[in-house]
Amino acid sequence: MANKLFLVSATLALFFLLTNASVYRTVVEVDEDDATNPAGPFRIPKCRKEFQQAQHLRACQQWLHKQAMQPGGGSGPSWTLDGEFDFEDDVENQQQGPQQRPPPPQQCCNELHQEEPLCVCPTLKGASKAVRQQVRQQQGQQMQGQQMQQVISRVYQTATHLPRVCNIRQVSICPFQKTMPGPGFY
């Protein structure tokens, strides 16, 4: 009888710990195609207003554009084989001298910290979409096909991990879903 009571108590305690631990990590998934959704990345009207008040995350847009346009990833963020950022490597390289990889500017992180946690991913998606349009307008004649897709993919991959880099509580990544085959995020 004592063994059963102990087993039930231990199971309940474990269940409580697992439930409590999962409350502190929230991932907001943005999975609608902007082309079929008239609200674009802003399914929540409050997020559209925050995006406009934050001046469309201007500092983040500038940084995303700069990182996406790095030729061959030369001095941009380093990537692991599974497409993840290797941020630890970036931090080490920042301390090694003049050829350092720039972290997101503090102003970009400040913009993200001012967002409601629920709106971080939708506003980042809006900023990424603006950068995508800017790249297409500026580079449309020089870049075609796969090269353009790679640049646009880098925009979204970089934006995906910005919440983690900027230490945004309750949001570690923004899992932007691919809506078309291939490496691009559209």
Swiss-Prot record:
Coiled coil: none
Keywords: Disulfide bond, Seed storage protein, Signal, Storage protein
The UniProt record lists the keyword Nucleotide-binding: no
UniProt GO molecular function: nutrient reservoir activity
Signal peptide: 1-21
Matches recorded under Gene3D superfamilies: Plant lipid-transfer and hydrophobic proteins
Record flagged with keyword Disulfide bond: yes
Residue ranges listed under propeptide: 22-38, 77-97
Tissue spec: Cotyledons and the axis.
PANTHER family hit by this protein: 2S SEED STORAGE PROTEIN 1-RELATED, BIFUNCTIONAL INHIBITOR_PLANT LIPID TRANSFER PROTEIN_SEED STORAGE HELICAL DOMAIN-CONTAINING PROTEIN
Subunit relationships: The mature protein consists of a small and a large chain linked by disulfide bonds.
Role played: The small, basic, water-soluble napins are one of the two major kinds of storage proteins synthesized in the seed during its maturation.
Protein name: Napin embryo-specific
Species, as recorded: Brassica napus
